[in-house]
Amino acid sequence: TQYSKKEEISTDSYQYLIGVSLPNVIEPWLNNFVDVFTEKVSQDKKINVIFRDAAGNPEKQIQDIETLMEYGIDILIVSPDGSDSLSSVLSEAFQKIPVILTGVGAGTEDYTCLIKSDDQKIGRLAGEYILNNLYEKNKKIVVFQGVEESPVSKQRLKGFQDSVQGTIPEEDITYYCGDWLRDRAELRMKDYLISHDSADIVFAFNDDMAYGAYQACQQYRIEGKVHLIGVDGFEGESAGLSLVDKGVLDATIQTPDFGGLSYEIARKLLEGNKVEKNIIIQPELILQGGAERKE
């Protein structure tokens, strides 16, 4: 990947050094995090950043954090993998410098700030949108979850299931794990279409998987008949907002700009300001033709 270039220290002179530890940058939201954070830092002469990608290996993420601490960083930003494996290394870091967590917690209260989305609400918004706008009796729904044990994926699933329970029969919903990846979702969608005539509605827990499902539908020439809902709502050529504008997705549920928010929180801390310990960002349903905020 191009990611290795971003692991280098990028500027010669700076006042503050930020270390960022990510569990697996292949996940689209973490890739977006890197892009946004890098862009912010490139415009800030006082700050430099070092990224470390654990590539899905929890042991490596612990080592990455220890290495970043050895570099003498001023702030540590970590996206945990959802387990408690980082709790002790984060506690050690927190004794010395501010620690910002993004996405999920890490089984410890030893952090300065946690930025997360209301993931149950994301699932609920999708379920309510499907019920109110798309679902009719006997319509078939395909749901693409993220990585099986991901807390984010579990929360989105709970929100969705709570919202449709008792209204949509279980036999009308098929669940797959797409592991957050476009290619995986495309393959699973093809598997589904081989054994079923068609699908009516797809809800994917990120826009990349929604687009993968769309590509499978294209190959079966049913793309115009299937309603697709994604999550993330990032900007970019094949990202969620663009896919909604083009009519590929019916809707996306926009999640926080983790890269931008993490940069702002880090900046405040470096300037000696206090920040909230827990920041929960409310999701927003984005439809074709504009945004519709749902409470």
Q: How would you name each of these model-derived features?
A:
Residues 17-36, 50-59, 80-83, 148-154, ...:
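Extracytoplasmic "Venus flytrap"
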Residues 61, 114-141, 155, 184-186, ...:
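Hydrophobic alpha-helical segments within soluble ligand-binding/sensing domains
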Residues 29-43, 47, 122-126, 151-169, ...:
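Short, solvent-exposed amphipathic alpha-helices that sit
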Residues 82-121, 234-245:
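Flexible loop/hinge segments that line or gate small-molecule binding clefts
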Residues 2-9, 148, 152, 164, ...:
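Hinge/cleft segment of the Venus flytrap/periplasmic-binding protein
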Residues 37, 41-54, 140-143, 164-183, ...:
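Short beta-strand elements in bilobed, periplasmic/extracellular small-molecule ligand-binding domains
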Residues 76-93, 160, 173-174, 178-239:
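Hydrophobic alpha-helical
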Residues 215-256, 263-270, 274, 279:
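Exported/periplasmic ABC-transporter solute-binding proteins
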